[in-house]
């Protein structure tokens, strides 16, 4: 084999091997940051406690506003919409008019007819932020003539 032929095989493999093309190693700085975060979270519950408290607060605010919050024992706050087009519309309005990003959850992730929005408040979210989200959702629900919780 000549040098060109010997060189062609690794190039071919690199060009067509999805395991190589779609794999990127993490930088040492990023790995160090992740390790520091894991060590911190193992030693501290401040962030977990804050996230749980904020999830409970947001659930209470949304329920108080009459919005259809689904039962959840986790930090995820699911809000039932029940229609994929309306879920997307709500997400689009939240982003365009309020600067709030949420991903609508549609089929096949959830069964048809059970489309929803899932909010995940973090420990750094404040009560005014969550109040603003609640007010935005209340306004959007009225604008789109969506049913409130029973």
Describe every region a protein language model picked out:
Residues 48-58, 63-99, 107-109, 114, ...:
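Conserved PLP-binding catalytic core of the aspartate aminotransferase-like
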Residues 8, 27, 106-109:
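Short, ordered loop/turn segments at secondary-structure junctions
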Residues 2-9:
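Short, small-residue-biased leader/transition segments that mark boundaries at the very start
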Residues 96-97, 109-150:
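PLP-dependent enzyme catalytic core of the Aspartate aminotransferase-like
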Residues 8, 29-49, 60-65, 83:
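Amphipathic alpha-helix from the class-I
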Residues 12-13, 90, 129, 133:
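Hydrophobic side chains in well-ordered alpha-helices
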Residues 17, 45, 55-56, 137:
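Short amphipathic alpha-helical/adjacent loop interface patches that line ligand
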Residues 11-26:
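Active-site PLP-lysine loop of aminotransferase-like
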